[in-house]
């Protein structure tokens, strides 16, 4: 599956805020946006008027970068969200939140969505007892996400499991630190999604 392979700090600088794509590094003085809080490139420090389309485009790009989704699958998520009953923008966010890599991150079993995606791809997690290595896998209410038994010996996995015990889990998930597993207890409501996304701008962009 295709994925972005460029510098993650450049993405944060482009959006003008921390997207927490590099986990622990984002909380240190090494964070690029703390040192250079302007857009990358030759004209990054210049000011220019942004059009309505430009604002909508930036909202979409920011959402894509937060969740690590390329343009074509992101458009597919939007079209799926349009077909669902309810508010399209909220449906879109709910689909993105239900990605397996995002759920692993939300449970604290990845320091960032980037790391969570990598761990899923390497087969460290099961869903309802079966190994799933597809980051975009859509979890459902009642699904149980767990660290594979053979993966629990990994030093990095051990560290993440220990740290997850002290991390606040979103209300739509529950986490059992003793067993290193979590469960989806509900679909996330809009107020339970803290990603800095202005979904109405994305809807406006795709409705042009």
Curated annotation (Swiss-Prot):
<dbReference type="InterPro" id="IPR018079">
    <property type="entry name" value="Ribosomal_uS4_CS"/>
</dbReference>
<keyword id="KW-0699">rRNA-binding</keyword>
<dbReference type="GO" id="GO:0006412">
    <property type="term" value="P:translation"/>
</dbReference>
<comment type="function">
    <text>With S5 and S12 plays an important role in translational accuracy.</text>
</comment>
<comment type="function">
    <text>One of the primary rRNA binding proteins, it binds directly to 16S rRNA where it nucleates assembly of the body of the 30S subunit.</text>
</comment>
<dbReference type="InterPro" id="IPR022801">
    <property type="entry name" value="Ribosomal_uS4"/>
</dbReference>
<dbReference type="InterPro" id="IPR005709">
    <property type="entry name" value="Ribosomal_uS4_bac-type"/>
</dbReference>
<comment type="similarity">
    <text>Belongs to the universal ribosomal protein uS4 family.</text>
</comment>
<dbReference type="GO" id="GO:0003735">
    <property type="term" value="F:structural constituent of ribosome"/>
</dbReference>
<dbReference type="GO" id="GO:0019843">
    <property type="term" value="F:rRNA binding"/>
</dbReference>
<dbReference type="GO" id="GO:0015935">
    <property type="term" value="C:small ribosomal subunit"/>
</dbReference>
<keyword id="KW-0689">Ribosomal protein</keyword>
<dbReference type="InterPro" id="IPR002942">
    <property type="entry name" value="S4_RNA-bd"/>
</dbReference>
<keyword id="KW-0687">Ribonucleoprotein</keyword>
<dbReference type="InterPro" id="IPR036986">
    <property type="entry name" value="S4_RNA-bd_sf"/>
</dbReference>
<dbReference type="InterPro" id="IPR001912">
    <property type="entry name" value="Ribosomal_uS4_N"/>
</dbReference>
<dbReference type="Pfam" id="PF01479">
    <property type="entry name" value="S4"/>
</dbReference>
<keyword id="KW-0694">RNA-binding</keyword>
<dbReference type="GO" id="GO:0042274">
    <property type="term" value="P:ribosomal small subunit biogenesis"/>
</dbReference>
<comment type="subunit">
    <text>Part of the 30S ribosomal subunit. Contacts protein S5. The interaction surface between S4 and S5 is involved in control of translational fidelity.</text>
</comment>
<feature type="domain" description="S4 RNA-binding">
    <location>
        <begin position="98"/>
        <end position="161"/>
    </location>
</feature>
<protein>
    <recommendedName>
        <fullName>Small ribosomal subunit protein uS4</fullName>
    </recommendedName>
</protein>
<dbReference type="Pfam" id="PF00163">
    <property type="entry name" value="Ribosomal_S4"/>
</dbReference>
């Amino acid at each position: 599956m295709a994925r972005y392979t460029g510098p993650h700090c450049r993405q944060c600088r482009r959006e003008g805020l921390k997207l927490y794509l590099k986990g622990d590094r984002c909380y240190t003085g090494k964070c690029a946006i703390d040192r250079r809080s302007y857009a990358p490139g030759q004209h990054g420090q210049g000011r220019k008027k942004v059009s309505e389309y430009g604002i909508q485009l930036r909202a979409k790009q920011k959402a894509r970068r937060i969740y690590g989704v390329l343009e074509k699958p992101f458009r597919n998520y939007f079209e799926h969200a349009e077909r669902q009953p309810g508010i399209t923008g909220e449906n879109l966010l709910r689909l993105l939140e239900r990605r397996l890599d995002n759920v692993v991150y939300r449970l604290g079993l990845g320091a960032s969505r980037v790391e969570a995606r990598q761990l899923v791809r390497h087969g460290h997690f099961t869903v309802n007892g079966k190994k799933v290595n597809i980051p975009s896998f859509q979890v459902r209410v009642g699904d149980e996400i767990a660290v594979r038994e053979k993966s629990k010996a990994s030093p990095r996995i051990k560290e993440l499991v220990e740290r997850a015990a002290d991390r606040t889990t979103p209300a739509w998930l529950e986490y059992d630190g003793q067993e290193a597993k979590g469960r989806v207890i509900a679909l996330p409501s809009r107020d339970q999604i803290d990603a800095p996304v202005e979904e109405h701008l994305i809807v406006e962009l795709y409705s042009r």
